[in-house]
């Protein structure tokens, strides 16, 4: 009976992030693309500012990396979120499954692991599909800061 209950319970509810396989870890990503938007850091305060400027490898329509398996070859500054460095990424969106599970919170109802597709996530406008712009179209990066400080107004 206990084995049946274990197998009926989704892995993200019965395992810690450290206990997950690499495939389980990867499947937690909802594919919103928020990690793939460029961030700017204030050199004086180390504060991070979010932009709507997409990485060159991000397909804005699908919110997927064009070269995910080889992304570090194309974008050396691409982030690699791991179990070990997760605490360093305080800027992760409040909707991020990695963040939520690390904080002991459930996955949102629109998460692809619960719905079986990314449609609900896109419908909730969680993905960057509706706000992202191509890096090649950007002239002044400050015009694309989403959480503008007073000095950038």
From Swiss-Prot:
Pfam families xref list: CxxCxxCC
InterPro entries: Puta_zinc/iron-chelating_dom, UCP006173
Residues in the signal sequence: none
Family recorded in the similarity comment: Belongs to the UPF0260 family.
Protein name from the UniProt record: UPF0260 protein YcgN
Organism field: Salmonella typhimurium (strain LT2 / SGSC1412 / ATCC 700720)
């Amino acid at each position: 009976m206990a084995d049946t209950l274990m197998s009926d319970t989704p892995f993200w509810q019965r395992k810690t992030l450290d206990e997950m396989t690499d495939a389980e870890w990867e499947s937690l990503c909802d594919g919103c693309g928020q990690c793939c938007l460029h961030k700017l850091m204030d050199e004086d305060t180390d504060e991070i500012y979010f932009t709507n400027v997409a990485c060159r490898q991000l397909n804005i329509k699908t919110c997927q990396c064009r070269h995910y398996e080889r992304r570090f070859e194309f974008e050396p500054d691409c982030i690699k979120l791991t179990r070990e460095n997760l605490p360093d990424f305080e800027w992760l969106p409040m909707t991020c499954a990695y963040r939520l599970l690390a904080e002991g919170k459930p996955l949102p109802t629109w998460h692809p692991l619960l719905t079986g597709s990314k449609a609900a996530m896109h419908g909730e406008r969680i993905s960057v599909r509706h706000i992202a712009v191509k890096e090649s179209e950007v002239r002044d990066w400050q015009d694309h800061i989403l959480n503008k400080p007073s000095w950038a107004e």
